[in-house]
């Protein structure tokens, strides 16, 4: 029988890893929850078992225990359910934002993995792993209450991990691997054009307060002078005495003409490189302990940011009108503001003066992991195992998409696009797994395991709809069945229950593209940003049914 792997098989596996993104990460943060079906059956407690080539991910030193040439290829299939109940989300002005999220996770998702090992001699074994280390897939309804934060997101990765292990003697082995990791991210969200229109109108009225107040106070005289009636959006605010209230009244009235949202889509990809190392100590034939470390990988994703305002309706006065400094403005300028025939579609203005399609980039540091594991063959039938994994999620303090400026684009009032930033301040986490094997017969091995996986989200105020993570609990079952002396199949099932995740995240930006100043939403502080402002408030309830199937063969 040939020992050569067909190139088409490797190409298929690599392509599948990108074509089938995972749902919301099954491990804490955005780690995908399983890189091996045999490991899934024990809730990933088997880091020191080294039962097949998937030990490349968990502890590469385990390769030294694998005789001959071995191949394992698996598929993880997820059936998630994620429900969101809104608890009073508001836009930047404090108005309720309504809309059903539906199930924010896809109906199903899948991710394959592939591992190969080859024993070169009594001391050296080499291998290759291709797997999904990170993944996320969120898919809210377009009109849900948190749409100004995000509507959909996809994070896809594939990791190529060639490894080598050296066995010093029957007690000590080490392993080392390098990783080439490809990552691709796509996210989509809504743009609050109505909010932006209200801000720009309010800024205009505030800067031209005397003229606007005069028009509201003596509309008949203004019409007599300029030959055009004062819009009711201004005259309806005649009775509002204080300046701030008057400005807000006029701005709100004009913004009520606006219907529909704009949309943005950000896409980027990158290659990054890292390494992993492991040590395996076998004090007796039936007992072994392992320690392994997987490095962080730094990615700088570069891609495109695109905007669409085709769904925006309504007409408002253009904010790009200069009334001059006098109490009696220019006649043409007044007609631009007062005559509805001269009003513009706010979506067209947003595309032409606020949001060009542009390049962008974001930096992502995947977290390093440190694992300590143990395995003990209690008797001929029963084996016990445990694993504790620490993950440095604190590397993620924020997600920031830097948006490049477009040369020659006529940014309104010089308000260029700022970064789109999501504050996270994640904390380091740990996962504790306990598992057991039971040799039911010569051909059938049964597995089970439980795990507690801590979430990196540090508070309700820092839980964002793009990262609705929470603590989770694993209950897993698995089996390995020998079809022939050289071929076996692995099966696994896990039920993953998430704690309820309450959210009350506030976006400090505003739809007009600036951080509001001390004077309120109509004052430009000079600090640029991309966002919509508002508060996303609600609660997530999530569980996942997780199935695994793998085929193993020894040559």
Go through the PLM ranges and name each one.
Residues 3, 90-98, 530-534:
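Low-complexity, polar-biased intrinsically disordered regions enriched in Pro/Ser/Thr/Gly
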